[in-house]
Amino acid sequence: MMAGIALGFQVPTSAMPMLCVSAALAGLLLLGRRRTRAAGCLLLTFLLGAALGIRTANPTLPPEGDAQVTGVVAGEVDFREEKGQVRVILRDVTLNGERIASGAYWTFYLKADENIPDCLTPGARISMTAEVYHPQGQRNPHGYDFRQALRQKNILIGLYGAAKLQALPDGLSLYGLAARFNHRMAQTLRDVCGEKAGQLASAVLLGMRDEVPDEEQEQFRRLGIAHILSVSGFHVGVLVALLALLMMPVKHRRLRMALTLPMLLAYAFLTGGNAPAVRAVLLWALVCWGRIRHKRVLMPHVLCASAMIQLMFAPAQLFSASFQMTYGVMAAICGITAQTAPNAQKKRGWKGKILSLLSVSAAAQFGVLLPELYWFGRVPLLGIAVNVLLVAGMNVLLLLDWVTLLLTPIPWLAALPGAATRAVSEGFLHLVNVLGRFAPTLWTRQPDAWVVLGWLLVFAALLPFGKSRNRWQNRKKRLPMLAAGAALMATILLPAPFSGTEYMQLDMGDADAAVLRQEKHVLVVDAGEYGGDLASYLRAEHLPVDLLVLTHLHSDHAGGVRELLDEGIPIRRCVMPSGALEADFDEEVLPLLARMEENGTVIETVCRGDILQWAEGKLTVLFPPEGFSASNANDGSMALLVEAEGVKLLLTGDLSARYGQYAAVSADVVKAAHHGSKNGTTQAFLDESAPTAVLVSTKRENAADYLRGITDADVYSTLESGAIIIRMADGHFTIEQFEEMQ
């Protein structure tokens, strides 16, 4: 089914008739013998997955435009104070009176003197007029897929604006009930346990991971234990153990299981249908159901059944980090510990228990390794060593959290476990922060097919199959597989294979960022306002930055340096135009320059006539001249002529039109100044440079229209194309558009 869903996301809806015909043919196999029926079942499951993938990837969406909207606030209101942006998830949504099947992602902005409206509380039903839009998918290689992230939450549309916002009478809404309960429980945990302990408890009990500050989540990632912040089978297992303890007076085993099952389902509902919580509850619910029916419970069967059930209702979950981590960990623990368990059982007392804990910890770290590499691009070297200690600490903490939560209706009784929870939580977080700051990690690229194959070979070598009477002979047979798998996995420490010369203009909206690659050499020109996609690309390809060019110090060109530094991407050298620090630069850029210097980056200023040798190419600074001074940073923006493989690229930053004549030289490709605005790029400038192609980084439709009106050159807009990729060789170049490649 997983393979079918993955395929379904890649094929158009026109493939549906062919799937139906294939399913009919596969159904005929069910009439055959046992093996033929098994093959038919496998094929039908694959085709079902493909159909689910196609339907999820190509949903029917309401039209874009203004609409009268009603909905229920299904979670905490997220307020980004630095931008004045409010983000809300809505459920039970209607557009112009018509109910839609999915939720909505709603954003709007507050003015400097405005507060969040009083009607925006978790569980509240509201009404407003807003603009409906369809979320965009991935716009850059290895970039963030906003549309996919929303699909994983069963959200298909976005809403912008909050005109005529008003509260409506609360109706019967399960989402509203769950949101109000979640909010009340989270507030109670903070009141009883303190702010930090309450945030951590809300994350691990109620699925409110966003309650934990970003800097603390980063420390968990550095230690390779980010998965313990999401509700999982481990967290729900502690709840099951606690319920079993409370139900000890109930002697009948089937009755205990029958009482536990609805409690688990109620817990999944009260988390607001949080996907990780539902997944974990589903795992344990299947275990309880099997025991009620006196069936032998095999964890591999439970894992497969729970995965199939969840994917049938939410196919997009296949591509979520939490889904991959949960099933990676559980599969590895079930498989690998079955091999090591006999050895642990032979060791009596504390030695056997320690060996069992270490084997489970190692299996968990191995199971989560591929998702960690894909999503975070690093190998935590202390993972196995600290996993046993921190998971044991989390076990104790979860017990305290549950006891505190269950006793909150009696405040004086909850005070004692609340104080203990606060002390243990603060100690736990302090330990995580200390270990996280000093924990060594290996920076890696994104796993490719060879790395995945290596992981599968190692996993297969550790599985308990093919037992031999001679233990050494059995191990000897596995060693080549283990060595080959480890060797393939080690290739992830190398940069991604690449040859030739390539320039890529990233889609950054009304901001700028570009990457020029030649073999192993990397040049970055500006970093955008938010450098998440740029950092993701460099991390996924395992590329340190040889030279960073900041055309000027406005945040839409230099602000993204923050994400490069946060991701630990090395920047060896940085250049900016002479006089950049005398112009009206954005103050938030100064700390970023200081951080680069602290990390060992060499920062220089350049002016007209300076030539920067880079790889086999040449970079000539055309503007500003030495001693140039301007109050407007755009007036002093650097213009750069890049010559590589016999192709000339003219990069103009945000250079103002009145100074464009000083940078107007012949070029094959021109990157339009100031996002294609009239005060940046003029017809005279394009006539002088005479390019065959013009690139513009913008989110405005009229920018490309303006440029097409003043030049006969081909105009490529990031709004229309996503990332624009230019491949150069032997004096020729080709242009590819990421949107078309997708």
Question: Where are these predicted regions, by residue range?
Answer:
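Non-globular, low-confidence helical/coil segments that flank catalytic cores
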Residues: 72, 96-99, 114-131, 142, ...
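Hydrophobic alpha-helical transmembrane segments in multi-pass membrane proteins
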Residues: 39-41, 159, 214-384, 445-498, ...
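Hydrophobic alpha-helical segments of integral membrane proteins
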Residues: 174-193, 200, 208, 216, ...
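Residue-level signal for inorganic ion chemistry
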Residues: 4, 71, 322, 368, ...
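N-terminal leader/targeting segments
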Residues: 1-63, 181, 279
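Aromatic-rich juxtamembrane segments at the membrane interface
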Residues: 152-283, 288-289, 573, 648-653, ...
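Membrane-interface helix/helix-cap signal primarily in integral membrane proteins
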Residues: 44-227, 535-536, 544, 581, ...
